[in-house]
């Protein structure tokens, strides 16, 4: 991934500079999250965008049809540049790097939360308060994902700190304790 980061960083930094100048950094951060969701959810879209067979103009037309009206001109211009330079393979790395730089600039802490099932709005709000207390700031960006292998509960990763409140984690710890006892 270091090579991809070295490719992604200049694009992400340029996007951050442009969005700062236009006062749309927060809006673009939200759009990056939405675009990443589309990218990760649609294998066909992802395959088409990274295909060397599809011409850059065709990729730009597809991007315009899919997200052209839903993103700021700054983001759409970045997408066009990535298509022109055959760099859409680094799309997700660029979006993730932008989000990293944005959080760093704004002093926002990233908390990754994996839960066994989707959380309700009330559960998300309660978890958000707990994570903010753990982080010591109310500037926390929570990345929620569902991981059925947890069986129940959740795992919170906040920097180097990991809180495993999952059923699979409890079973694993119990197994280790039993192994030590025997």
UniProtKB/Swiss-Prot annotation:
* Range of residues in the leader sequence: none
Membrane-protein topology: Peripheral membrane protein
Tell me the InterPro entries matching this sequence.
ATP_synth_OSCP/delta_N_sf, ATPase_OSCP/dsu
Q: Keywords in UniProt for this one?
A: ATP synthesis, CF(1), Hydrogen ion transport, Ion transport, Membrane, Thylakoid, Transport
Keyword Transport in annotation:
yes
- Gene Ontology cellular-component terms listed: plasma membrane-derived thylakoid membrane; proton-transporting ATP synthase complex
Q: Where is the protein found, in the record's own terms?
A: Cellular thylakoid membrane
Main subcellular localisation:
membrane
Q: Which GO terms describe its molecular function?
A: proton-transporting ATP synthase activity, rotational mechanism
Where on the tree of life does the source sit, at the highest rank?
Bacteria
Pfam families given for it?
A: OSCP (PF00213)
Tell me, in a sentence or two, what this protein's role is.
Answer: F(1)F(0) ATP synthase produces ATP from ADP in the presence of a proton or sodium gradient. F-type ATPases consist of two structural domains, F(1) containing the extramembraneous catalytic core and F(0) containing the membrane proton channel, linked together by a central stalk and a peripheral stalk. During catalysis, ATP synthesis in the catalytic domain of F(1) is coupled via a rotary mechanism of the central stalk subunits to proton translocation.
Q: How does it assemble?
A: F-type ATPases have 2 components, F(1) - the catalytic core - and F(0) - the membrane proton channel. F(1) has five subunits: alpha(3), beta(3), gamma(1), delta(1), epsilon(1). CF(0) has four main subunits: a(1), b(1), b'(1) and c(10-14). The alpha and beta chains form an alternating ring which encloses part of the gamma chain. F(1) is attached to F(0) by a central stalk formed by the gamma and epsilon chains, while a peripheral stalk is formed by the delta, b and b' chains.
Task: Kindly give the HAMAP family that the UniProt entry links to this protein.
Answer: ATP_synth_delta_bact
* PANTHER family attached to this UniProt entry: ATP SYNTHASE DELTA CHAIN (PTHR11910)
Family statement drawn from the similarity comment of this UniProt entry? Belongs to the ATPase delta chain family.
What name has this protein been given in UniProt?
ATP synthase subunit delta
The gene it comes from is atpH
């Amino acid at each position: 991934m270091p090579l991809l980061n070295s490719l992604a960083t200049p694009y992400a930094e340029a996007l951050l500079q442009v969005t700062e100048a236009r006062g749309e950094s927060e809006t673009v951060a939200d759009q990056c999250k939405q675009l990443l969701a589309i990218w990760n959810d649609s294998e066909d879209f992802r395959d088409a965008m990274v295909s060397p067979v599809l011409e850059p103009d065709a990729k730009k037309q597809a991007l315009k049809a899919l997200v052209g009206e839903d993103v700021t001109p700054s983001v759409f211009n970045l997408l066009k540049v990535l298509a022109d330079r055959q760099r859409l393979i680094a799309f997700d790395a660029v979006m993730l790097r932008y989000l990293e730089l944005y959080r760093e600039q704004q002093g926002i802490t990233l908390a990754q939360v994996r839960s066994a099932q989707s959380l309700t709005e009330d559960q998300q709000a309660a978890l958000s308060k707990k994570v903010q207390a753990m982080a010591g700031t109310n500037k926390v960006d929570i990345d929620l994902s569902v991981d059925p292998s947890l069986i129940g509960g959740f795992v919170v990763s906040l920097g180097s700190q990991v809180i495993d409140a999952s059923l699979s984690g409890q079973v694993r710890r119990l197994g280790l304790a039993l192994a030590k006892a025997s």
